[in-house]
Each structure stands twice: as C-alpha cells, then as structure tokens.
Design a protein with these regions (language model features):
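Transmembrane-helix signature of polytopic, membrane-embedded enzymes
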Residues: 95-107, 123-150, 169, 183-193
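Membrane-interface alpha helices of multi-pass inner-membrane proteins
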Residues: 29, 143-144, 189-204, 211-215, ...
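Hydrophobic, aromatic-rich transmembrane alpha-helices
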Residues: 126-127, 219, 226, 278, ...
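Transmembrane alpha-helix segments characteristic
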Residues: 2-5, 142-146, 292, 359-383
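Perimembrane helix-loop-helix junctions
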Residues: 210-291, 346-361
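Membrane-lumen/periplasm interface segments of specific transmembrane helices
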Residues: 213, 218-224, 281-350, 368-380, ...
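Aromatic- and kink-enriched transmembrane "portal" helix at the membrane-lumen/periplasm boundary
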Residues: 101-124, 143-173, 177, 198-207
Length: 491
C-alpha cells in the first residue's frame, strides 16, 4: 500500500533545476555521460545562458575561477551521479524515442534525475521502516511521519536534483547493512558495509563521518571478544518466548520471527560462537579495504578535477573544526534544525529512550546512533555556511532520516497504553503540519527564504495557509510554473 501511495504522489515531483547545488550535481552526471570527463565549463555555461545559473556569485565562482588542475570548480561529489545513472539512461532512451534533443540537458534528462531522486528518497523511507522494525518491532507509522514531517519531503518533490534524497537513501542503506552485519561480523558482511560506506561518502562527503557509529560498535565487539574470549550472548527475545508487554521495546513475536528468517539467530545481537580476535581483525581490514576500493571513483574524480586526491580547497577552508556553531545549528531561532524540524526533537528523545530502556543488545545500537547524530551536529556546526540560508531547512540533516525514524518508532512504541499518547499525537501532528506549511510558505514566497521568523511563520502556517490551501494545491498540481515564473534563481 505504501508503494501505491508513493506512486500516486509522483505527479507532485518537480522536474526542474534552478539552484547552484543542483547544477553542480547534475553537471557531474551530464559531463561524465556525454563528455567522459569532469570538466564542467560547458554545463555551467549552458545553465547560465539559460538564465538558470544566475544566482548571486554563480558566475564569479563557477565561470571565472579555475582549480589547480585547470578546470572549473565543483563542490559536488560523484555519488549522486552514480545513483542517477540508471534513470539517466532511461531519460536518454526517452529522448531518442520521443524526439527530444539528445544533449543531456533536455526535459527527459532533467525529469529522470528528479524522479530518480524521489524514488531514492522513498527507498530511504522503506529502509528506515525496516530498520525501525528490526530494532523495536514496528516502524511504518514512524516512517510515514518522518517522510512528511521533515525536509526530505521538500527534497523529494520540490527540489529533487539536490543530493539530499540520495543522501537519505545512502545512509539508510549503510545503517541497514550495519544492522544485518553486526549479527555475525563476517568478512563478507564487512565488505558489504565498507562498500555501502563508500557510496555514502561519495554522495555527500559530510556523511562519511557517520561511519563512526558502526566503527565504535565493531571496536566494542572486538574488545569484548578479546576480554571474554567468548562472544556468545543470548538473543534478547526468542520468537517462542512470551509476548512483549504493551509499550515494551522488545520487538513483537511476529517481528522476532521475521528477523529470525533474515538470519540464523534473529535480530540484532552479538553472534554466538568462538570468534577470535585474529578473525575480527581480518574482518575490520576487509571492511577498510572495501571502503577504499569503493571510494576510488571519487578519489580519481578529485584528482582530475582538483589536481589532488581531496576536495577543493574552497571547501576545506570553510571548515572551523572547533564547531563554533554547533548549538546554533540546532536551536537558532532563525536557522536551527529543531526550529525548522521540531519532529526531530521527538525522534531524538526516542533514541535516548532506546539507549536507556532498550534490550541489552539494542542499547549499543541506540548509543551508536546518538553518536552519529552528535558527529553530524559537530560537522554541520563547523561549516562556515552553517545557516544554509536560502535553502529549505537544515538540509544537511536529511541524511539522518533512518535514525530519526528509529527514534520516533521507539517513542511511539513506549507510549502505547500511556495516558500521554493522545497529547504526543497532537504534538506530532502539529510538527508534521509545520513542515508542510513551511514548504508551502517557502514555495509561495510567504516567508523569508534567508531565515526563519518563527512568530510570522506560525501565523502563516496556522492562519494564512489553511485559507489558501485549495488554491495552492491547485496551482501546484496544474500550474506549478506560477510559483517560480519570473523569480530570480537562488544559489
């Protein structure tokens, strides 16, 4: 049913490129596909000539400067291009059959990338639901709420050529593989995890730091094996055991049985056996080698584009590693993640609850998930452009979709039968509407795109937009160009 619901929403996807980030990520794919290089000058010039790349500073940044390798700079990475390649091929076939110009820029190519991003965003939701079900027994409602109640919705439907929907997918895939691999920590599993981590890092460089969660988890397992010389720990809940009490964080009997079908011993536990430290060291090395090999496309692209095996110096010099804006990136009234996306607060509360009240084998996962959130906050607070002014939401946190789903699923689980459940339900509904309303206000010009103004935003969300909702919905479905006609492109 969820797949059918997503299919029904596909007409809401906007096949359009307008921002500099979208241009950079799209140019990566177009240049590799048609020119077989990472020289983006012709792509940048095309968008500038089409009055698309006309945001403040676009020409000066991308059509005047050169890298050390003598190419026009790009702050994008290759991962989104890799993920978009299959749908871009479909777009090329459509262009050939339908008589569109086969130049890599025409409508079928842009539409392919846009719809591809939407599909990857939806895949992220499916993986997130599966991860939550694996840990707490249910995740469907939490996944739907995170889908609608976070900026992922915007980057799936309104501005899909950004990398954020792909980022949500890559991180969700990485976490899903981790949850499966940690049951046994085999060499094959470590290779899969390393490759998933490489994809995650190639989609967005910042997301590479999320590997710290599984790394800490693995090191903890390695230390435990070294100290005890016995990695056997009983499964937290046998599928033949008693049915969990309402609100318990142990997965239901059916969920446990489903997990048992996925692996020989069930969900998410330290594998029984006689694994040696020597074998685990080999497992760790296999994961590292797999990551290095998987990341090779990005390293080669760095070298060809920047003249060295690393990001542009224009990126690295924007970082202040003391993270002076860590608190602001969360709680600034004008730019904070929690103000843009209050549903995230409830989700993080859920992760804390899982870390404190989860079963012994689930608590380490929750603690590692909280560590992953913390390092994402740290990096986001280290970037000079931490405000991400002009974009919708604290978009760098879209990568945490899977972790937010797990946290929210936990909160919903523990509130079963609790007198506070209706109150929390109302709060969740308000959080979801807040996100939808901000998207509408952002698209219609009813808010300042450079910053939040909470009091004014609240008035628009709860007074103005309900009256305008029918007209906005009609325009979005049947006259979408009316939202951006004659609007100057933004960086």
């Amino acid at each position: 049913m969820l797949v059918v619901a997503f299919a029904i929403t596909l007409p809401a996807v906007t096949p359009r490129i307008y921002a500099s980030d979208e241009i950079q990520y799209f140019s990566y794919l177009r240049s590799l596909w048609f020119d077989r290089d990472v020289s983006f000058e012709n792509e940048y010039q095309y968008f500038f000539d089409q009055n698309i790349g006309r945001g403040e500073g676009f020409y000066a940044t991308f059509l005047e400067h050169y890298t050390e390798a003598g190419r026009r700079p790009s702050f994008a990475t290759i991962g989104s291009a890799i993920l978009w390649a299959p749908v871009y091929l479909a777009g090329d076939l459509v262009a050939r059959m339908a008589g569109y110009e086969r130049d890599g820029f025409s409508y079928p190519y842009v539409a392919a990338v846009a719809y591809g991003s939407a599909c990857y965003g939806f895949a992220a939701i499916l993986l997130s639901i599966a991860a939550a079900r694996r840990l707490v027994g249910d995740g469907m409602l939490a996944g739907i709420l995170v889908w609608i109640g976070t900026p992922l919705l915007f980057y799936m439907y309104v501005s899909p050529p950004y990398s954020h929907a792909c980022s949500a997918f890559a991180v969700a895939l990485f976490v899903t593989v981790w949850l499966r691999v940690r049951e046994s920590w085999t060499i094959g599993g470590a290779i899969a995890l390393g490759l998933a981590g490489a994809l995650m890092a190639m989609v967005r460089e910042q997301d590479a730091i999320l590997a710290v969660g599984p790394i800490v988890d693995f090191v903890g397992y390695l230390i435990k094996s070294h100290v005890t010389r016995d990695s056997s720990v009983s499964i937290y809940q046998s599928s033949r055991g008693p049915t969990p009490a309402r609100g318990s964080l142990a997965p239901s009997r059916s969920a446990a049985a489903a997990g048992a079908a996925d692996s020989p011993t069930g969900i998410n536990h330290w594998q029984s056996g006689t694994a040696t430290v020597h074998r685990l060291v080999l497992v760790g090395l296999a994961g590292c080698v797999a990551f290095a090999l998987g990341f090779l496309p990005q390293l080669l692209a760095y070298k060809a584009l920047n003249g060295h095996y690393g990001p542009s110096s224009m990126v690295t010099r924007k970082m202040t590693w003391t993270s002076p804006h860590a608190l602001e990136v969360l709680a600034s009234p004008a730019h904070g993640f929690f103000i843009w996306t209050p549903l995230a607060v409830l989700a993080l509360v859920g992760l804390v609850v899982l870390a404190r009240r989860g079963t012994p084998v689930v608590r380490p996962v929750a603690l590692c998930a909280l560590l992953m959130v913390a390092v994402q906050i740290y990096v986001s607070g280290s970037v000079e452009s931490w405000t991400v002014a002009g974009a919708f939401g604290q978009r760098r946190f879209v990568a945490l979709t899977v972790l937010l789903t797990i946290g929210l699923a936990t909160l919903l689980k523990v509130l079963q039968g609790n007198a506070l459940r209706p109150v929390v339900g109302i709060v969740i509904a308000l959080c979801v509407w807040w996100n939808v309303a901000l998207i509408a206000a952002f698209g219609t010009g009813l808010m300042n795109r450079q910053k939040l103004e909470p009091r004014q935003n609240a008035y628009v969300a709860f007074v103005t937009l309900p009256r305008m909702a029918p007209d906005i919905a009609y325009r979005y479905l049947f006259s979408r160009e009316s939202f951006y006609r004659n609007r100057r492109a933004e960086p």
